Amino acid sequence: MPMLRVLVLESAGPVEVGGLLLTPARSGLSVAGKPVGALWRAQGDGPHEVGPLRVRGEVEVRRTPDGLRVVNLVGLEDYVTATLGRELYPDWHAETQKAQAVLARTFALYRRSAGNAGFDLRSGDSDQVYGGVAGETPAARDATRETSGEVLLYEGQPILAAYHSSSGGRTASAAEVWGRPVPYLESRRVEGEEDSPDTYWRVRFTGTTLGRALDPLGLHLGRVTEVRVGARTASGRVQSVELLGTAGRGELDGRALREALGHNVVRSTLFEVRESDDGFVFVGSGHGHGVGMSQWGAEAMAREGADYRQILAAFFPGTSLARAAER
């Protein structure tokens, strides 16, 4: 079974693994006060406690110029199970769970092939949310087992298996979000997302709050007095925004504004901005970058009778299912 190197933690200071305190030292690191060199491995296959996580497989801690790096060496199928419980509701349809299992497995192999120095994936939502043992729900175990080894391929290689919570009715293409076209990641209409809590959302900001959020980006506008949505992408997402403030004006793209305000606050770039008495109201739909499979859209398809193969074919046209061992 393929193994993955999952970055669990990076810290400038001490970290705790299995009840042992590991501390950076001048010549490497120390465990419980004893020098052990630049690399230390936990004994056994776990589960090991690493900060808030309990993980299977091996754990290694390496001294880096910035402190300590904790990496979990875990089997691909165990990794898939541990992500599913963090990505989907446990009571969702079995076919949705299986579609997500294939995507989690495919994304992991895609990232592994990129050859990052020291690890394959991060454990947070910049890659996939990895829950360790706590993510291993019964539904996750079943979906992993029933799709064991299956991945999506395009021209014989694992695809960029992108997904998001909900699309707001239409997915985005890879070209409009990441600036490069991907044949199997085009925009498509999505039905059945009405049950998503993010079908319609709104959030308020004062002009002062907006101005402060932009300061780290180098846009020192003071109190924001006007927000103008400029260009939109083909799927309707905000591409550019102009902001006027008491200390100047600035322009940035919609994704940068979303990140500055919090990607779980402004849940997507499919929004419009309205003025209010004390500032601005962002009114939008969907949650996430919008590329690839909508999880809520997949769940709607499953409830209507689609199996996981049909779900994946709908969201990733031109790809094929195969077993990783066959590659």
Pin down the residues of each PLM region.
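Conserved, single-site charged/polar hotspot
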Residues: 1-327
